[in-house]
Every structure is written in structure tokens, then in C-alpha cells.
Amino acid sequence: LTLQEKQHTADTLLRRINALHEPGETVRLMEVCGTHTVSIFREGLRQLLPSGIELVSGPGCPVCVTDQTYMDKALAYAEREDTIIATFGDMLKVPGSYSSLSEAQTKGAHIHVIYTPLEVIELSKKHPEKKIVFLAIGFETTIAVICATVKAVHEAGLKNVFFLVSHKLV
């Protein structure tokens, strides 16, 4: 988008917010991810909102708030020759206490970026000699697709797929 298009979009959104907001009413909106919080602050959006609309910083996205213990477990699995880590790309740079998946990958760890959890099934079939460890991370809204994947793995009779789970509750 050009700067003019961005300005037009912002103006349109602000007009809609002002039209929907009832004077004297308090509306609280939660920005869930720390990246959103930074963007809102940097762009000065808080100051543009009418009084009565409050922005509340939330818990942080599951990736941003992943603890080092979880990452250290993932790294320990990644360092095993008999293991492939299946993960979403945004997990690659999350630091553990001594490394990250991205760094481990440069040292020869088998890290496979996936776009949907169900990809672990094909990965498992392609590499039956390897243990496939899926880093199942997300909010409670993503649990259903993880459960569907667990069920599909079970129904396919795959014995080499494992789930390292860390879901967050909003």
C-alpha cells in the first residue's frame, strides 16, 4: 500500500470506530501479541482512539512467551540423530537457554518447517526410521487441529510421531 492508501485506510477505520462507540461507554480491546503492542505504541494509535476505548496488553502470543524449558526440551530432541523436529517457522528463532532451533539447524539438526500439523503424517511416512517430534504450540483455539492430528496419526497406525505440547490459555 502507498502512504496515501494507508492514511485513507486508517482514516476510514477511525471514522468507523468513532461511529460505533457510544459516548460514556467503556470498551476494552486486548492486543494479544507483544508485536501488536509495540506497533500500536510506535504508530501512536492509542492517542487516536476516542476516550472510553482502552487497549489492554494481553498474555503475548504462544511463540513470544514460550519458556526456555520448553525450547531446551525441543533442542534436546533436535540434537538426536534419530529425530526430526516438525515445527512452524516462527519457532525457529525462539531462544532456549543455550541455543535456538535455527542455530541447531545450522549445526545439522533435522528441523522441518510445516504449515499445518497434518503434514507430520507425510513426514512420518517419508521417514519411518526417524522419530518425528511436532512442536504443538498455540492458544486454546488451535487445540482442535492438534487433536485431529493426534487422531489421524493414531488411525494411520504411525508409531514414530510424538507431540511436545505447550498451549496457552487466553
Predicted feature locations:
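Metallocofactor- and cofactor-centric catalytic cores in central/energy metabolism, strongly enriched
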Residues: 1-129, 143, 153-155, 164
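Phosphate/pyrophosphate-binding betaalpha-module
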Residues: 135, 139-170
